[in-house]
């Protein structure tokens, strides 16, 4: 991959570097927002050890240079090697240690995914109850631990970055202190907190996608989100459709040229005033679909709908609106 250096602004950015399980880097600003490549909008990077540079994996732009590697000096290729060579503890996190311990799952299924018989199910319910009681004392602690476990589970299922989960836990803590959780399910409130945190961190996820991974209904989660928005003193930015592009492109393995074209389409749509009141995920999917057709990638609208977490009808309607309003002549398949 060829690298392109960005023009220097004179003042270096102060970014915190996180590394995921696949070895890719994510950058977090001092204000807690996820940093994105200014060229293509991607949020995943790699580290060039020889040059001390952080490089975008999509377009190859160098977003940070002349960095010191603050990680360990040793290399490990398996989790066993990493555990043997590590000489320090885990990084500090808002997620309390009790929330990261092994718990008995709520699905009441065995290791093969089969439903437990009624006798075994009652036994598991009793064990789950005693495990919760043994770990914490007060109702406040039990509720908070349960929420932390639920957020950790959602993080693993959805692939949400840890900064978003930590922010969601902080939101839940505030809701718990104001007694907003009383009378509402922990699952719905935790999902609403995560939805809010992802938007605050500029890494929005569609609500329908989040609901697929929780026991709470879409109506419950939406109601809890509106409650948090009304009662907590937090500022949630309006979702920018551009923020959805990198994730759609990553799932469909699209080129950097398609990403740039999709971003340009959305920027033109904003200037034309046709993005207000529209679902940002649907707009992003339609823009990427148009950009793909313009670059000869003739995939179906269903592919883009699945990647964005919206319906095929939404992609089709937004596609027609963008093409008509911006006078884009899309090549016919």
From Swiss-Prot:
Keywords, alphabetical: Metal-binding, Repeat, Transcription, Transcription regulation, Zinc, Zinc-finger
Residue stretches of each Sequence repeat: 149-232, 243-324
GO BP annotation list: transcription preinitiation complex assembly
Taxonomic superkingdom: Archaea
GO cellular component term of the entry, any: transcription preinitiation complex
Zinc finger map (TFIIB-type): 33-64
Signal sequence bounds: none
Binding site for Zn(2+): 37, 40, 56, 59
The keyword Coiled coil is assigned to this record: no
Entry GO MF terms: DNA-binding transcription factor activity; TBP-class protein binding; zinc ion binding
Function: Stabilizes TBP binding to an archaeal box-A promoter. Also responsible for recruiting RNA polymerase II to the pre-initiation complex (DNA-TBP-TFIIB).
Family note: Belongs to the TFIIB family.
Protein name in the entry: Transcription initiation factor IIB
Protein source organism: Pyrobaculum arsenaticum (strain DSM 13514 / JCM 11321 / PZ6)
Gene name per UniProt: tfb
């Amino acid at each position: 991959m060829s690298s392109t250096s960005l023009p220097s602004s004179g003042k270096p950015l102060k970014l915190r570097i996180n590394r995921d399980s696949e070895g890719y880097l994510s950058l977090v600003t001092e204000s807690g927002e996820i940093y994105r490549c200014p060229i293509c909008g991607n949020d995943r990077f790699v580290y060039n050890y020889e040059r001390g540079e952080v490089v975008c994996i999509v377009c190859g732009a160098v977003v940070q240079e002349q960095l010191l590697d603050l990680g360990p000096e040793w290399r490990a290729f398996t989790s066993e090697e990493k555990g043997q060579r590590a000489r320090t503890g885990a990084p500090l996190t808002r997620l309390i240690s009790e929330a990261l311990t092994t718990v008995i799952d709520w699905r009441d299924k065995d290791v093969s995914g089969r439903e437990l018989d009624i006798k075994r199910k009652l036994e598991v319910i009793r064990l789950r109850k005693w495990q919760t009681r043994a770990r914490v004392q007060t109702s406040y602690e039990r509720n908070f631990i349960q929420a932390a476990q639920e957020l950790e589970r959602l993080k693993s299922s959805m692939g949400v970055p840890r900064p978003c989960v930590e922010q969601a836990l902080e939101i839940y803590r505030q809701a718990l202190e104001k007694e907003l959780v009383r009378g509402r399910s922990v699952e719905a409130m935790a999902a609403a907190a995560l939805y809010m945190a992802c938007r605050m961190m500029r890494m929005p996820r569609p609500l329908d996608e989040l609901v697929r991974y929780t026991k709470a209904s879409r109506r419950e989660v939406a109601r809890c989100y509106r409650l948090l928005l009304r009662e907590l003193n937090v500022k949630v930015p309006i979702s920018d459709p551009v923020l959805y592009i990198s994730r759609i492109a990553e799932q469909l393995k699209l080129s950097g040229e398609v990403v740039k074209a999709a971003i340009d389409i959305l920027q033109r749509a904003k200037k034309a005033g046709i993005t207000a009141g529209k679902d940002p995920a649907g707009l992003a999917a339609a823009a990427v679909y148009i950009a793909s057709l313009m670059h000869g990638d003739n995939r179906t609208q269903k592919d883009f709908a699945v990647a964005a977490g919206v319906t095929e009808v939404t992609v089709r309607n937004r596609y027609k609106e963008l093409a008509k309003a911006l006078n884009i002549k899309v090549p016919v398949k």
